[in-house]
Amino acid sequence: MTDAKPLASALAGVSLIGAPTDIGAGMLGARMGPAALRVAGIAQAVSQFGIDVRDCGNLDGPANPWQDAVDGFRHLPEVVAWNRLLHDAVFAELSDARLPI
């Protein structure tokens, strides 16, 4: 027998983290995802279940340099920078017992 709590009761809430970028993507549009989810009411939809929602806003990473792919990779240094930013933001929320979305 374990003393593990259900996940929902172990969490302090959820945190919305926007990463508005389409760097590295073959098609444009992914950068609009965070705004679209907010306009669609993701925070309200989650909070109606009694879950605390923290909107952390959008991360601010490097701009798209609009260059051709090199060896099959699009904007690799910028993609790495975005991933590091997102990693740090997710780690901070997990460290605060929050589920990052």
What are these regions (language model features)?
Residues E78-I101:
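Active-site pocket-lining segments that scaffold enzyme catalytic pockets across diverse folds
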